Amino acid sequence: MEKNAAAEIATTADKTRLISPFAETVGSLAVEAMLYEVTCTPSPGLVDRVNSGAHTDMDFYSFMSSSAALSICMTRCVQAGLNHGGTLPALLPVLRRIGIDGEARMLQATGGVNTQKGLLFSLGIVAAAVGWLQHTRNRQDSGSILQCVAAMTAGIVTRELGNMDKSVTSLTAGEKLYRLHGVTGIRGEMEQGLPAVLEHGLPTLRQAMADHLTVNSALLQTLLVLMTVVDDTTVMNRHHP
């Protein structure tokens, strides 16, 4: 049964290689968001145009390379949502399959450096939610999109972090922080429907743009607000909590 299920997931993921114009449009917006993130300068503790922050193995150009490599993956995530006729939790294994391919592309582009695996996970799921809403309801708004994200990832913290039997030395950074400090990281944010984005990030960004700030200033203001409410496990790990 598991073998058949895996084959079905692989077939479903492969179907996303046939891309619709809608998926191309949303996928390009996802890549634009990825590029905007790294061009926001200064970004304390993070990679930006002039500094690598807490990172010693990557820089601005690493992110340019990986963003380009992940572009097709983002489009395929949108297409996966458009194609999906089942429940939202059933879409997640398909996205994981696409994500594995995306991660391989990213690592090849960066010489083996993990620049945007977390963003591949989070933004890929958001992109798929947009596709699913277009297919099922012909609508997209931030609240509905993030409700879909929560439904798609329901129970992910317990499944992936709550039942670990690994030794501490074999844990990933996120797993170690959860075991030692109870930090749920991006999985917890996704399972809750990215509340920091909905309640803090988006209102701040929209107000900044309404106040006619430059794009960089608006992004920086949004970043600083998010830093007050989000636990960044990457920065926490690289600064040895």
Regions found by a protein language model. Name each.
Residues 1-85, 92, 130-241:
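Phosphate-rich cofactor/ligand-interacting catalytic cores and adjacent structured alpha/beta frameworks
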Residues 74-132:
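Long, hydrophobic/aromatic-enriched structural stretches that serve as scaffold segments
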